[in-house]
């Protein structure tokens, strides 16, 4: 809650004539911040970077008070946050560091011995590499779905029809699978 209060106070100081209602913005922050950070941790592999990118997404939202009447603020936030996260990965010369951090997080949450840890780490590195080769929209689809978003939430975030998400997701999964197998043909199971 400290982060929400600090961010909220800071944003109120920088507000212009037209600004967000502080209570409304605080509610949006509380509803979406934790989930957006979780999605970004999966993407970036580092909680500190995920917090930074999430805060940037909320700053961008706050600077656009017209979005109060948008009706799909959550979708706008998810799309903006994943776009920003993808940009961070692309611009960073430390992609490998992010991949290793993401694998460490996965390893911390999964029991197993050193060999299991090593295999999981390598698998995470491969998955992140293949995700970086996909079209941004395909990578976003897969990341949002793996984070547990529903088809409707994904549709809202990517501004597509909810009825299209299943087909788009199938195509993204197939593209991911094809690229993964092409790069790692001897791996038994995806």
Residue spans for each PLM region:
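Structural recognition of an alpha-helix C-terminal capping motif at a helix-to-coil junction
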Residues: 52-59, 63, 71-83
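DNA-recognition helix of helix-turn-helix
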Residues: 82, 86, 158-183
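Acidic, proline/glycine-rich intrinsically disordered inter-domain spacer in sigma factors
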Residues: 23, 27, 103-132
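Arg/Lys-rich amphipathic alpha helix in sigma70-family domain 2
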Residues: 79-100, 120, 182
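C-terminal edge and immediately downstream basic/flexible tail or linker adjoining helix-turn-helix-like DNA-binding
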Residues: 1-9, 13-19, 24, 96-99, ...
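C-terminal flanking helix
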Residues: 33, 37, 58, 135, ...
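Helix-turn-helix DNA-binding module
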Residues: 132, 136-139, 147-167, 178
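A short, charge-rich alpha-helical start-of-domain segment used by transcription regulators
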Residues: 14-38, 48
């Amino acid at each position: 809650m400290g982060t929400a209060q600090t961010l909220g106070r800071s944003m109120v100081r920088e507000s212009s004539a037209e600004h967000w209602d502080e209570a409304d913005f605080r509610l949006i922050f509380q509803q979406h911040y934790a989930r957006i950070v979780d999605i970004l941790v999966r993407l970036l592999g580092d909680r500190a970077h995920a917090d930074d990118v999430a805060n940037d997404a909320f700053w961008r939202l706050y600077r656009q008070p017209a979005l109060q009447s948008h009706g799909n603020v959550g979708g706008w936030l998810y799309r903006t946050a994943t776009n920003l996260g993808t940009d961070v990965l692309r611009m960073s010369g430390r992609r490998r560091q992010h991949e290793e951090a993401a694998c460490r997080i996965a390893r911390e949450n999964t029991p197993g011995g050193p060999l299991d840890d090593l295999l999981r780490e390598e698998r995470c590195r491969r998955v992140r590499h293949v995700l970086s080769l996909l079209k941004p929209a395909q990578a976003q689809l897969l990341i949002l779905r793996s984070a547990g978003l529903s088809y409707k939430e994904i549709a809202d975030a990517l501004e597509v029809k909810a009825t299209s998400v299943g087909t788009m997701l199938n195509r993204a999964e197939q593209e991911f699978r094809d690229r993964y197998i092409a790069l790692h043909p001897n791996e038994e199971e995806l």
